[in-house]
Amino acid sequence: MDVLTVENELRQVVSRLVTQVELATKQGKLDINLALEDALIPILKELFHLPKLHNLNAKQKNFPGIDLGDEFDRVAFQVTATTDLEKIKKTLNVFIEKNYQSNFDELYVLMLVKKQKSYSQLSIDKITGDVFTFNTNTHVIDPGDILAKASNLRVTAQKRILHEFKLI
């Protein structure tokens, strides 16, 4: 399988997943979001080089503010289908209230559907201040960003990511 074939297949699989999330969300069925937290772990491990990434909700049911974390490499993820600025602000408020910055240097908000074109960095900076750095251009990611990151990998890694997406 050549690179172009893998990338095309990845795009098809991810676009189906995004559509499923959008439709489930419109129906008020949020179970797909919870299932995706676990399903995305091997993909995020590969893309972000986080071998110890795990679901924090397994540690504590409904872990507040963040869903996935790698305490060794100090990276956390909030996985959500909500794409508005308020969701990001709420996540950051909880992150700082719970002092997660003492365990995690980076936080990504992973939108399961297409993110907005932009988010107010000024609004975010008012929350984070000097306590924590969060850049809306790099730390708010969506399936398009996942595909872009995957396209920079070797074809063997892309195949592994494609395999994981097909399992979802």
Predicted features, each with a name:
Residues M1-L10, T82-I168:
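Acidic metal-coordinating catalytic centers involved in nucleic-acid phosphodiester chemistry
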Residues M1-N55:
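Acidic-basic catalytic patches of nuclease active cores, encompassing PD-(D/E)XK
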Residues L23, Q27, P51, E71, ...:
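A near-ubiquitous, low-amplitude feature marking generic local secondary-structure context
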Residues L10-R11, R16-A24, K59, L68-G69, ...:
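Generic ordered-secondary-structure signal
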Residues I32-I96:
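Catalytic centers of nucleases
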